[in-house]
Regions:
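C-terminal motif of bacterial Sec signal peptides marking the signal peptidase cleavage site
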Residues: 18-20
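Functional-site microenvironments in short loops/helix caps that host divalent-cation chemistry
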Residues: 25-40, 62-63, 69, 74, ...
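Short, P/G- and charge-enriched loop/turn segments at secondary-structure junctions
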Residues: 48-50, 80-83, 443, 473-478
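Short, surface-exposed beta-strand/loop micro-motifs that present aromatic residues
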Residues: 59, 84-86, 335-337, 477-478
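Catalytic loop of the DD-peptidase/beta-lactamase superfamily, centered on the K-T-G motif
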Residues: 472-475, 485, 491-492, 496
Length: 504
Protein backbone atom coordinates (compact mmCIF):
# COMPACT_ATOMS: atom_id res chain seq x y z
CA UNK A 1 0.00 0.00 0.00
CA UNK A 2 1.61 3.29 -1.12
CA UNK A 3 1.72 6.55 0.81
CA UNK A 4 -1.06 8.25 -1.23
CA UNK A 5 -3.49 5.41 -0.52
CA UNK A 6 -2.71 5.52 3.21
CA UNK A 7 -3.21 9.30 3.24
CA UNK A 8 -6.59 8.99 1.50
CA UNK A 9 -7.78 6.31 3.92
CA UNK A 10 -6.66 8.40 6.88
CA UNK A 11 -8.53 11.45 5.57
CA UNK A 12 -11.72 9.45 5.02
CA UNK A 13 -11.43 7.89 8.48
CA UNK A 14 -10.97 11.32 10.09
CA UNK A 15 -13.98 12.74 8.23
CA UNK A 16 -16.16 9.83 9.35
CA UNK A 17 -14.97 10.23 12.94
CA UNK A 18 -15.70 13.96 12.97
CA UNK A 19 -19.12 13.43 11.40
CA UNK A 20 -19.86 10.79 14.00
CA UNK A 21 -18.80 13.13 16.79
CA UNK A 22 -20.97 15.91 15.42
CA UNK A 23 -23.91 13.53 15.09
CA UNK A 24 -23.41 12.21 18.62
CA UNK A 25 -23.10 15.74 20.00
CA UNK A 26 -26.30 16.73 18.23
CA UNK A 27 -28.09 13.59 19.44
CA UNK A 28 -26.99 14.32 23.01
CA UNK A 29 -28.29 17.89 22.77
CA UNK A 30 -24.86 19.48 22.65
CA UNK A 31 -23.64 22.00 20.07
CA UNK A 32 -21.05 20.45 17.77
CA UNK A 33 -19.37 23.84 17.27
CA UNK A 34 -19.33 25.34 20.80
CA UNK A 35 -19.89 22.42 23.15
CA UNK A 36 -22.73 24.20 24.96
CA UNK A 37 -25.88 22.24 25.77
CA UNK A 38 -29.10 22.72 23.87
CA UNK A 39 -32.41 23.10 25.75
CA UNK A 40 -30.58 23.83 29.02
CA UNK A 41 -32.84 25.87 31.29
CA UNK A 42 -29.93 26.61 33.60
CA UNK A 43 -27.63 27.61 30.74
CA UNK A 44 -28.16 29.69 27.62
CA UNK A 45 -31.77 28.50 27.23
CA UNK A 46 -31.20 27.93 23.50
CA UNK A 47 -34.09 25.72 22.38
CA UNK A 48 -33.60 23.18 19.58
CA UNK A 49 -36.10 20.75 18.05
CA UNK A 50 -34.52 17.33 17.51
CA UNK A 51 -35.69 15.12 14.60
CA UNK A 52 -38.31 17.69 13.65
CA UNK A 53 -40.78 16.80 10.91
CA UNK A 54 -42.73 19.54 9.15
CA UNK A 55 -46.49 18.98 8.94
CA UNK A 56 -48.18 19.32 5.57
CA UNK A 57 -50.82 22.09 5.86
CA UNK A 58 -54.46 20.92 5.94
CA UNK A 59 -55.93 20.26 2.51
CA UNK A 60 -52.59 20.52 0.74
CA UNK A 61 -50.17 18.27 -1.13
CA UNK A 62 -46.36 18.46 -0.85
CA UNK A 63 -44.88 19.01 -4.30
CA UNK A 64 -41.21 18.33 -4.96
CA UNK A 65 -39.78 21.11 -7.12
CA UNK A 66 -37.16 20.90 -9.82
CA UNK A 67 -36.13 22.08 -13.26
CA UNK A 68 -38.66 22.09 -16.10
CA UNK A 69 -39.52 23.84 -19.34
CA UNK A 70 -42.21 26.44 -18.88
CA UNK A 71 -44.11 27.87 -21.84
CA UNK A 72 -46.26 26.96 -24.82
CA UNK A 73 -46.83 23.34 -25.79
CA UNK A 74 -49.31 24.04 -28.58
CA UNK A 75 -49.88 26.81 -31.08
CA UNK A 76 -52.85 29.12 -31.54
CA UNK A 77 -52.00 31.09 -34.67
CA UNK A 78 -54.14 34.13 -33.84
CA UNK A 79 -53.17 34.28 -30.16
CA UNK A 80 -50.49 36.50 -28.65
CA UNK A 81 -47.07 34.84 -28.36
CA UNK A 82 -46.70 35.60 -24.66
CA UNK A 83 -45.44 32.26 -23.31
CA UNK A 84 -42.28 31.33 -25.19
CA UNK A 85 -40.60 28.18 -23.87
CA UNK A 86 -37.71 28.59 -21.41
CA UNK A 87 -36.14 26.45 -18.69
CA UNK A 88 -36.44 27.42 -15.03
CA UNK A 89 -36.28 25.82 -11.59
CA UNK A 90 -39.11 25.85 -9.05
CA UNK A 91 -38.53 25.25 -5.33
CA UNK A 92 -40.59 22.63 -3.51
CA UNK A 93 -43.92 23.94 -2.25
CA UNK A 94 -47.41 22.97 -1.13
CA UNK A 95 -50.60 23.34 -3.14
CA UNK A 96 -54.27 22.69 -2.41
CA UNK A 97 -55.42 19.33 -3.71
CA UNK A 98 -58.72 20.86 -4.77
CA UNK A 99 -59.96 24.26 -5.90
CA UNK A 100 -61.40 26.37 -3.08
CA UNK A 101 -65.06 25.35 -2.74
CA UNK A 102 -68.26 27.25 -2.03
CA UNK A 103 -68.38 25.68 1.44
CA UNK A 104 -64.86 26.95 2.14
CA UNK A 105 -65.80 30.49 1.16
CA UNK A 106 -69.01 30.33 3.19
CA UNK A 107 -66.95 29.33 6.22
CA UNK A 108 -64.93 32.50 5.61
CA UNK A 109 -67.95 34.80 5.21
CA UNK A 110 -69.63 33.19 8.23
CA UNK A 111 -66.55 34.02 10.35
CA UNK A 112 -66.57 37.58 9.01
CA UNK A 113 -70.27 37.92 9.87
CA UNK A 114 -69.79 36.48 13.36
CA UNK A 115 -66.85 38.76 14.17
CA UNK A 116 -67.63 41.98 12.30
CA UNK A 117 -71.35 41.71 11.52
CA UNK A 118 -72.49 44.09 14.29
CA UNK A 119 -69.68 46.62 14.19
CA UNK A 120 -68.39 46.64 10.59
CA UNK A 121 -70.97 45.24 8.12
CA UNK A 122 -69.08 46.80 5.19
CA UNK A 123 -66.19 44.41 5.82
CA UNK A 124 -68.61 41.48 5.64
CA UNK A 125 -70.12 42.76 2.39
CA UNK A 126 -66.64 43.18 0.90
CA UNK A 127 -65.98 39.44 1.39
CA UNK A 128 -69.08 38.30 -0.50
CA UNK A 129 -68.66 36.86 -4.02
CA UNK A 130 -70.25 38.68 -6.92
CA UNK A 131 -73.32 36.66 -7.91
CA UNK A 132 -74.12 38.95 -10.83
CA UNK A 133 -71.34 37.37 -12.87
CA UNK A 134 -73.86 34.64 -13.80
CA UNK A 135 -76.04 37.10 -15.71
CA UNK A 136 -75.82 37.02 -19.50
CA UNK A 137 -78.05 39.04 -21.79
CA UNK A 138 -79.16 36.04 -23.86
CA UNK A 139 -79.20 33.28 -21.22
CA UNK A 140 -81.47 32.47 -18.26
CA UNK A 141 -79.02 32.05 -15.38
CA UNK A 142 -80.94 33.59 -12.46
CA UNK A 143 -81.12 30.22 -10.60
CA UNK A 144 -77.31 30.19 -10.48
CA UNK A 145 -77.23 33.75 -9.16
CA UNK A 146 -79.68 32.81 -6.39
CA UNK A 147 -78.37 29.34 -5.48
CA UNK A 148 -74.84 28.61 -6.68
CA UNK A 149 -73.03 30.06 -3.67
CA UNK A 150 -75.60 29.41 -0.95
CA UNK A 151 -77.37 26.09 -1.67
CA UNK A 152 -75.85 22.94 -0.08
CA UNK A 153 -76.15 21.13 -3.42
CA UNK A 154 -73.28 23.32 -4.61
CA UNK A 155 -71.11 22.98 -1.48
CA UNK A 156 -68.43 20.93 -3.25
CA UNK A 157 -68.33 23.12 -6.34
CA UNK A 158 -65.56 25.69 -6.86
CA UNK A 159 -66.12 29.25 -5.71
CA UNK A 160 -66.40 31.74 -8.59
CA UNK A 161 -67.16 35.44 -8.76
CA UNK A 162 -64.24 36.40 -6.52
CA UNK A 163 -61.57 38.88 -7.53
CA UNK A 164 -57.82 38.40 -7.23
CA UNK A 165 -57.90 40.82 -4.30
CA UNK A 166 -60.60 38.80 -2.52
CA UNK A 167 -58.61 35.61 -3.09
CA UNK A 168 -55.57 37.23 -1.46
CA UNK A 169 -57.71 38.32 1.51
CA UNK A 170 -58.93 34.74 1.86
CA UNK A 171 -55.33 33.46 1.89
CA UNK A 172 -54.46 35.90 4.69
CA UNK A 173 -57.57 34.88 6.66
CA UNK A 174 -56.78 31.17 6.18
CA UNK A 175 -53.22 31.69 7.43
CA UNK A 176 -54.51 33.18 10.67
CA UNK A 177 -57.23 30.60 11.23
CA UNK A 178 -54.87 27.64 10.62
CA UNK A 179 -52.18 29.07 12.92
CA UNK A 180 -54.75 29.97 15.57
CA UNK A 181 -56.06 26.38 15.50
CA UNK A 182 -52.48 25.02 15.66
CA UNK A 183 -51.81 27.03 18.84
CA UNK A 184 -55.13 25.93 20.36
CA UNK A 185 -54.44 22.26 19.59
CA UNK A 186 -50.97 22.58 21.13
CA UNK A 187 -52.49 24.03 24.31
CA UNK A 188 -50.68 27.35 23.89
CA UNK A 189 -53.78 29.55 23.76
CA UNK A 190 -57.49 29.11 24.46
CA UNK A 191 -60.11 28.97 21.74
CA UNK A 192 -61.76 32.37 21.17
CA UNK A 193 -65.06 32.99 22.94
CA UNK A 194 -67.34 33.96 20.07
CA UNK A 195 -70.24 34.28 22.50
CA UNK A 196 -68.57 37.30 24.08
CA UNK A 197 -68.85 39.21 20.80
CA UNK A 198 -72.55 39.79 21.49
CA UNK A 199 -71.51 42.10 24.34
CA UNK A 200 -68.76 43.89 22.42
CA UNK A 201 -69.67 47.02 20.51
CA UNK A 202 -66.20 48.56 20.29
CA UNK A 203 -64.91 47.82 16.80
CA UNK A 204 -61.31 48.79 17.66
CA UNK A 205 -61.29 46.41 20.63
CA UNK A 206 -62.48 43.52 18.46
CA UNK A 207 -59.86 44.19 15.77
CA UNK A 208 -57.03 44.81 18.23
CA UNK A 209 -57.67 42.21 20.92
CA UNK A 210 -60.17 39.57 19.77
CA UNK A 211 -59.04 38.78 16.22
CA UNK A 212 -56.01 36.49 16.08
CA UNK A 213 -53.40 37.48 13.51
CA UNK A 214 -50.12 35.62 13.09
CA UNK A 215 -47.93 38.69 12.58
CA UNK A 216 -49.66 40.51 15.43
CA UNK A 217 -48.99 37.53 17.70
CA UNK A 218 -45.31 37.42 16.71
CA UNK A 219 -44.58 41.17 16.64
CA UNK A 220 -46.94 42.96 19.04
CA UNK A 221 -45.73 42.47 22.61
CA UNK A 222 -48.98 43.83 24.06
CA UNK A 223 -51.14 41.29 22.22
CA UNK A 224 -51.58 38.28 24.51
CA UNK A 225 -54.39 35.79 23.80
CA UNK A 226 -55.75 33.84 26.77
CA UNK A 227 -53.37 31.08 27.90
CA UNK A 228 -54.16 27.48 27.09
CA UNK A 229 -53.54 24.31 29.13
CA UNK A 230 -49.89 23.91 28.12
CA UNK A 231 -48.31 27.32 27.52
CA UNK A 232 -44.61 27.62 26.72
CA UNK A 233 -42.33 28.83 29.52
CA UNK A 234 -38.85 30.34 29.60
CA UNK A 235 -36.05 29.31 31.99
CA UNK A 236 -37.45 31.42 34.80
CA UNK A 237 -40.87 29.80 34.52
CA UNK A 238 -42.50 32.82 32.89
CA UNK A 239 -45.04 32.17 30.14
CA UNK A 240 -43.68 33.14 26.74
CA UNK A 241 -45.11 33.35 23.26
CA UNK A 242 -44.44 30.73 20.62
CA UNK A 243 -42.25 31.79 17.71
CA UNK A 244 -41.41 30.19 14.37
CA UNK A 245 -38.52 28.21 15.91
CA UNK A 246 -41.02 26.16 17.95
CA UNK A 247 -42.25 24.55 14.73
CA UNK A 248 -45.95 24.97 15.55
CA UNK A 249 -46.87 27.84 13.23
CA UNK A 250 -47.25 27.48 9.48
CA UNK A 251 -45.93 29.82 6.82
CA UNK A 252 -48.32 32.09 4.89
CA UNK A 253 -50.97 30.76 2.56
CA UNK A 254 -50.95 32.61 -0.78
CA UNK A 255 -51.79 32.25 -4.43
CA UNK A 256 -49.31 30.12 -6.40
CA UNK A 257 -46.92 31.89 -8.74
CA UNK A 258 -47.49 31.25 -12.43
CA UNK A 259 -44.35 29.09 -12.55
CA UNK A 260 -45.49 27.02 -9.54
CA UNK A 261 -48.98 26.59 -10.96
CA UNK A 262 -47.72 25.42 -14.35
CA UNK A 263 -45.17 23.08 -12.74
CA UNK A 264 -47.87 21.57 -10.51
CA UNK A 265 -50.34 21.23 -13.38
CA UNK A 266 -48.04 19.29 -15.69
CA UNK A 267 -46.79 17.15 -12.77
CA UNK A 268 -43.86 15.96 -14.86
CA UNK A 269 -41.64 13.38 -13.16
CA UNK A 270 -38.34 11.99 -14.38
CA UNK A 271 -38.20 8.20 -14.59
CA UNK A 272 -34.46 7.57 -14.41
CA UNK A 273 -31.29 9.65 -14.20
CA UNK A 274 -33.28 12.88 -14.40
CA UNK A 275 -34.62 12.09 -17.88
CA UNK A 276 -38.16 13.08 -18.82
CA UNK A 277 -39.61 10.91 -21.59
CA UNK A 278 -42.74 12.89 -22.37
CA UNK A 279 -43.43 16.58 -22.94
CA UNK A 280 -47.07 16.79 -21.89
CA UNK A 281 -49.74 18.84 -23.59
CA UNK A 282 -52.17 18.49 -20.66
CA UNK A 283 -51.97 17.46 -16.98
CA UNK A 284 -52.42 13.87 -18.17
CA UNK A 285 -50.33 11.80 -20.59
CA UNK A 286 -51.05 11.85 -24.29
CA UNK A 287 -52.42 14.46 -26.67
CA UNK A 288 -56.08 13.37 -26.32
CA UNK A 289 -58.70 14.75 -23.94
CA UNK A 290 -60.62 11.45 -23.69
CA UNK A 291 -59.77 8.57 -21.35
CA UNK A 292 -57.91 5.84 -23.30
CA UNK A 293 -58.36 3.10 -20.66
CA UNK A 294 -61.04 0.48 -21.34
CA UNK A 295 -62.83 1.05 -18.04
CA UNK A 296 -63.85 4.61 -18.93
CA UNK A 297 -63.03 4.61 -22.63
CA UNK A 298 -64.06 7.81 -24.37
CA UNK A 299 -64.94 9.77 -21.23
CA UNK A 300 -63.66 13.33 -21.02
CA UNK A 301 -60.73 13.92 -18.66
CA UNK A 302 -61.79 17.48 -17.83
CA UNK A 303 -64.78 19.81 -17.77
CA UNK A 304 -64.72 22.01 -20.88
CA UNK A 305 -66.72 22.84 -24.02
CA UNK A 306 -66.48 20.02 -26.57
CA UNK A 307 -67.84 22.11 -29.43
CA UNK A 308 -70.36 24.75 -30.34
CA UNK A 309 -73.37 24.37 -28.04
CA UNK A 310 -72.05 21.13 -26.51
CA UNK A 311 -71.25 21.63 -22.82
CA UNK A 312 -71.67 18.08 -21.48
CA UNK A 313 -72.81 15.58 -24.12
CA UNK A 314 -76.24 14.23 -25.08
CA UNK A 315 -79.02 13.17 -22.73
CA UNK A 316 -78.89 9.48 -21.87
CA UNK A 317 -75.16 9.35 -22.47
CA UNK A 318 -73.72 12.45 -20.85
CA UNK A 319 -69.96 12.74 -20.96
CA UNK A 320 -68.43 15.26 -18.55
CA UNK A 321 -71.96 15.70 -17.05
CA UNK A 322 -71.42 19.36 -16.17
CA UNK A 323 -73.33 22.19 -17.79
CA UNK A 324 -71.35 24.68 -15.74
CA UNK A 325 -68.79 23.81 -13.06
CA UNK A 326 -68.45 20.34 -11.51
CA UNK A 327 -67.51 19.10 -8.04
CA UNK A 328 -63.87 19.80 -7.22
CA UNK A 329 -63.07 16.08 -6.78
CA UNK A 330 -64.45 15.13 -10.20
CA UNK A 331 -62.20 13.62 -12.90
CA UNK A 332 -58.84 11.91 -12.47
CA UNK A 333 -56.08 13.75 -10.55
CA UNK A 334 -52.66 14.34 -12.10
CA UNK A 335 -49.40 12.71 -10.99
CA UNK A 336 -49.13 15.04 -7.98
CA UNK A 337 -52.64 14.12 -6.84
CA UNK A 338 -54.10 17.51 -7.80
CA UNK A 339 -57.63 17.66 -9.21
CA UNK A 340 -58.92 19.83 -12.05
CA UNK A 341 -55.67 21.48 -13.04
CA UNK A 342 -57.30 21.66 -16.48
CA UNK A 343 -60.92 22.67 -16.96
CA UNK A 344 -63.73 23.28 -14.47
CA UNK A 345 -62.59 26.82 -13.55
CA UNK A 346 -59.66 28.97 -14.50
CA UNK A 347 -57.49 29.85 -11.51
CA UNK A 348 -55.93 33.10 -10.36
CA UNK A 349 -52.16 33.06 -9.90
CA UNK A 350 -49.95 35.56 -8.10
CA UNK A 351 -48.21 37.14 -11.10
CA UNK A 352 -48.72 40.50 -12.73
CA UNK A 353 -49.31 39.96 -16.44
CA UNK A 354 -46.77 41.06 -19.03
CA UNK A 355 -46.69 39.68 -22.59
CA UNK A 356 -42.87 39.81 -22.43
CA UNK A 357 -42.51 37.80 -19.22
CA UNK A 358 -40.22 35.32 -20.97
CA UNK A 359 -37.67 38.01 -21.89
CA UNK A 360 -36.71 39.03 -18.36
CA UNK A 361 -36.94 36.36 -15.68
CA UNK A 362 -35.08 34.71 -12.86
CA UNK A 363 -33.82 31.19 -13.50
CA UNK A 364 -35.33 30.00 -10.22
CA UNK A 365 -38.68 30.82 -8.61
CA UNK A 366 -39.56 33.05 -11.57
CA UNK A 367 -42.19 35.64 -10.60
CA UNK A 368 -43.29 39.13 -11.60
CA UNK A 369 -45.27 41.15 -9.07
CA UNK A 370 -43.03 41.74 -6.06
CA UNK A 371 -44.17 44.50 -3.71
CA UNK A 372 -42.06 44.47 -0.55
CA UNK A 373 -44.15 45.34 2.50
CA UNK A 374 -42.96 46.88 5.77
CA UNK A 375 -44.99 46.76 9.04
CA UNK A 376 -46.17 50.21 10.14
CA UNK A 377 -44.75 51.22 13.54
CA UNK A 378 -47.13 53.49 15.45
CA UNK A 379 -44.97 54.18 18.51
CA UNK A 380 -42.78 52.49 21.13
CA UNK A 381 -43.74 51.39 24.64
CA UNK A 382 -42.03 52.33 27.90
CA UNK A 383 -39.22 49.79 27.47
CA UNK A 384 -38.61 50.45 23.79
CA UNK A 385 -40.68 47.70 22.14
CA UNK A 386 -42.23 48.72 18.84
CA UNK A 387 -46.01 49.18 18.83
CA UNK A 388 -47.44 48.26 15.43
CA UNK A 389 -50.50 49.78 13.84
CA UNK A 390 -53.45 47.39 13.50
CA UNK A 391 -55.79 47.64 10.50
CA UNK A 392 -59.57 47.23 10.36
CA UNK A 393 -59.31 43.43 9.98
CA UNK A 394 -57.15 43.01 13.08
CA UNK A 395 -53.93 42.52 11.12
CA UNK A 396 -50.62 44.36 11.35
CA UNK A 397 -50.84 47.21 8.88
CA UNK A 398 -48.13 47.37 6.22
CA UNK A 399 -46.80 49.99 3.82
CA UNK A 400 -44.69 50.04 0.68
CA UNK A 401 -41.43 51.94 1.00
CA UNK A 402 -40.05 53.94 -1.90
CA UNK A 403 -38.55 51.70 -4.61
CA UNK A 404 -40.08 48.59 -2.98
CA UNK A 405 -42.74 48.19 -5.68
CA UNK A 406 -41.00 46.36 -8.53
CA UNK A 407 -44.00 45.03 -10.43
CA UNK A 408 -42.92 46.82 -13.60
CA UNK A 409 -39.19 46.08 -13.31
CA UNK A 410 -37.77 45.56 -16.82
CA UNK A 411 -41.24 44.88 -18.15
CA UNK A 412 -40.50 45.77 -21.75
CA UNK A 413 -42.30 49.13 -21.89
CA UNK A 414 -40.76 52.14 -23.60
CA UNK A 415 -39.47 53.60 -20.35
CA UNK A 416 -37.66 50.52 -19.07
CA UNK A 417 -36.65 48.94 -22.36
CA UNK A 418 -35.43 51.82 -24.50
CA UNK A 419 -34.80 54.71 -22.14
CA UNK A 420 -32.69 53.36 -19.31
CA UNK A 421 -29.78 55.59 -20.34
CA UNK A 422 -32.14 58.56 -20.59
CA UNK A 423 -32.76 58.31 -16.86
CA UNK A 424 -29.03 58.62 -16.24
CA UNK A 425 -28.20 61.56 -18.54
CA UNK A 426 -31.53 63.39 -18.83
CA UNK A 427 -33.90 62.75 -15.89
CA UNK A 428 -36.21 65.52 -17.09
CA UNK A 429 -36.53 63.86 -20.48
CA UNK A 430 -37.57 60.60 -18.82
CA UNK A 431 -40.15 62.46 -16.73
CA UNK A 432 -41.61 64.07 -19.87
CA UNK A 433 -41.77 60.68 -21.55
CA UNK A 434 -43.80 59.27 -18.66
CA UNK A 435 -46.13 62.28 -18.52
CA UNK A 436 -46.84 62.18 -22.26
CA UNK A 437 -47.77 58.51 -22.47
CA UNK A 438 -51.22 57.80 -23.90
CA UNK A 439 -53.82 57.40 -21.16
CA UNK A 440 -57.07 57.99 -23.08
CA UNK A 441 -58.99 54.69 -22.73
CA UNK A 442 -60.77 55.33 -26.05
CA UNK A 443 -57.44 55.43 -27.88
CA UNK A 444 -56.74 52.06 -29.52
CA UNK A 445 -53.03 52.57 -28.89
CA UNK A 446 -53.53 52.99 -25.14
CA UNK A 447 -52.10 50.16 -23.08
CA UNK A 448 -54.78 47.99 -21.44
CA UNK A 449 -52.25 46.25 -19.21
CA UNK A 450 -51.31 47.79 -15.86
CA UNK A 451 -49.57 46.81 -12.63
CA UNK A 452 -52.96 45.56 -11.43
CA UNK A 453 -53.50 43.14 -14.31
CA UNK A 454 -53.16 39.54 -13.09
CA UNK A 455 -52.68 36.19 -14.79
CA UNK A 456 -55.20 33.35 -14.70
CA UNK A 457 -54.67 29.85 -16.11
CA UNK A 458 -56.15 26.40 -16.57
CA UNK A 459 -59.19 26.61 -18.83
CA UNK A 460 -62.78 26.27 -17.62
CA UNK A 461 -66.24 24.84 -18.16
CA UNK A 462 -66.90 27.51 -20.82
CA UNK A 463 -63.55 27.25 -22.68
CA UNK A 464 -62.46 25.28 -25.74
CA UNK A 465 -59.80 22.60 -25.49
CA UNK A 466 -56.88 24.89 -26.39
CA UNK A 467 -57.07 26.62 -22.99
CA UNK A 468 -56.74 23.31 -21.10
CA UNK A 469 -52.99 23.32 -21.72
CA UNK A 470 -51.36 24.62 -18.50
CA UNK A 471 -48.94 26.77 -20.50
CA UNK A 472 -51.70 29.02 -21.87
CA UNK A 473 -52.24 32.28 -20.03
CA UNK A 474 -54.80 35.07 -19.95
CA UNK A 475 -55.25 38.17 -17.84
CA UNK A 476 -57.83 40.23 -15.99
CA UNK A 477 -57.67 43.23 -13.66
CA UNK A 478 -57.28 42.20 -10.03
CA UNK A 479 -60.54 43.89 -8.98
CA UNK A 480 -62.64 42.05 -11.57
CA UNK A 481 -64.34 38.64 -11.29
CA UNK A 482 -65.95 36.10 -13.61
CA UNK A 483 -68.14 32.99 -13.47
CA UNK A 484 -65.31 30.83 -14.78
CA UNK A 485 -62.44 31.98 -12.52
CA UNK A 486 -61.70 30.49 -9.09
CA UNK A 487 -58.46 29.71 -7.29
CA UNK A 488 -56.52 27.40 -5.00
CA UNK A 489 -53.91 28.27 -2.38
CA UNK A 490 -50.21 27.49 -2.21
CA UNK A 491 -47.52 27.76 0.47
CA UNK A 492 -43.73 27.86 0.30
CA UNK A 493 -42.20 24.68 1.71
CA UNK A 494 -40.02 25.03 4.78
CA UNK A 495 -37.28 22.40 4.84
CA UNK A 496 -36.79 19.37 2.63
CA UNK A 497 -39.59 17.55 0.82
CA UNK A 498 -38.37 14.38 2.57
CA UNK A 499 -39.13 15.89 5.99
CA UNK A 500 -42.87 16.33 5.45
CA UNK A 501 -45.56 14.54 7.43
CA UNK A 502 -49.29 14.67 6.81
CA UNK A 503 -51.12 16.77 9.40
CA UNK A 504 -53.16 14.60 11.72
Amino acid sequence: MNFKTIAKLATISLAITLAGCASKSSDKGVSSVTGWKYNDKEGTEFLVKNNFKTKVPPGMVAIEGGSFTVGERGEFITATRDNTRRRITVSSFYMDQYEIRNIDWREYTNWMQRVFGKTAPKLVAKAQPNGKIWREELAYNEPYLENYFTHPSFDQYPIVGVTWEQAMDYCAWRTDRVNEKALIDAGIIEAPDFGSLAKKEDFDSIATNFVFNTQKYLLQSSYKPAEGRRPKEDASGQVRKVDMSDGILFSDFRLPTEAEWEFAAYATRSEKDGLVKESKMYPWSGAQVRVPAKKALGQMQANFVRGRGDMMGTSGSLNDKATITAEVNKYTPNNFGLYNMAGNVNEWVLDVYRPTSFEELSEYNSFRGNVYLTPVVESTDEIGNKVYKIDSLGRVQTKVEKNDDVRNFKDGDATSQYNFSLALVDPKGLENLKNNQKIDPTDVLCAKITDKTRVYKGGSWKDRVYWLSPSTRRFLDQDKSANDIGFRCAMSMIGSVDDQTTKK
